[in-house]
Design a protein with these regions (language model features):
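Signal that preferentially marks extracellular ectodomain short beta-strand elements
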Residues: 1-31, 107-115, 192
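Beta-strand-rich modules
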Residues: 23-50, 90-94, 112-132
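Short beta-strand edge segments in extracellular beta-sheet folds
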Residues: 55-59, 137-140
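Proline-enriched interdomain boundary motifs that mark the N-terminal boundary
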Residues: 63-71
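N-terminal exported-region signature
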Residues: 137-272
């Protein structure tokens, strides 16, 4: 038995106190603690009988502090993410979640080799399996030399072209959207009719050399409808069902959709 604490008797018929548990219940195991009471009196010590003992458990459901992403950088296709975290006494590890994998680490950095496109966010996890809120997400987008047709699943609150393109500033020479465009001018910045990047839009990103665009923000709202007008529309697809075939993705448009064009690929609908 482990002694927890003592309280003074003051002539009451009943007493109430707060007793500490020695372990917390977890997601997979409810750990009960047995309590007994010893009354120390002039006549001697009186111990509660075994069938009079109490049982209880405690749950740690306090979420850990959320890490803060501080930087993302790359060399060739190798990307490094860094974050700050105020260490708490019950800290267990950080969980890094991406579109295709989950990694755990006790450090404040994570590195990976980019294969086309990925998005990462971090949670801190404590010994009792509690997760912090998600950090902001970091989107990593590989770009080939020349023109690249891309859309954005992650955007910062400041979605200006200057902010979104900051990581490739100097290498990027132009961005073209539907009916809008902007060119990068050294010592001046971005100039043109394209002021901001939106979740519904698709864009041609033009770069001098192979690069990676790194953008920090939050996943875009998947419920926003992207309106289509008659003719050609330059839009993004930011929700992909298990069946992401062209037939399924455009099924809601019926016979109204006659064709779709991507970067270096295209498909036309032929009746009959």
């Amino acid at each position: 038995w482990t002694s927890l604490h003592s309280i003074a008797a003051y002539g009451s018929e009943t007493y109430q106190t707060v007793a500490e548990t020695l372990n917390n219940a977890t997601e997979t195991d409810t750990i009960y603690t047995e309590f007994r009471i010893i009354a120390s009196m002039n006549e001697g010590n009186y111990v509660s009988l075994d069938d009079e003992n109490g049982f209880g458990y405690s749950v740690d459901n306090i979420h850990p502090a959320t890490p803060e992403l501080t930087s993302a950088e790359h060399e060739d296709m190798d990307v490094s993410l860094n974050w700050q975290y105020e260490l708490e006494e019950d800290f267990a590890y950080h969980r890094i979640t991406s579109l295709n994998s989950i990694d755990n680490t006790i450090s404040n950095e994570h590195s990976f080799t980019l294969d086309g496109h990925d998005e990462h966010w971090v949670n801190s996890v404590d010994y009792n399996g509690n997760y912090s809120d998600n950090t902001e997400s970091i989107m990593s987008m590989a770009l080939g030399q020349g023109a690249n047709l891309r859309s954005f699943n992650v955007l910062p609150d400041d979605n200006s072209i200057t902010n979104v393109m900051a990581s490739i500033e100097g290498n990027a020479t132009g961005v073209i959207g539907e009916g809008v465009a902007a060119n990068y001018m050294e010592d001046i910045g971005w100039m043109g009719s394209l002021d901001e990047i939106t979740s519904c839009g698709a864009y041609w990103l033009i770069v001098n050399e192979e690069d990676i665009l790194l953008t920090t923000g939050y996943p875009t709202d998947r419920t926003i409808p992207c309106e289509l007008h008659a003719g050609a529309n330059l839009i993004s697809f930011y929700v992909f069902p298990e069946d992401n075939s062209v037939t399924n993705m455009l099924s809601s448009l019926g016979d109204n959709a006659t064709g779709i064009i991507g970067e270096g690929v295209a498909a036309s609908k032929i009746n009959g």
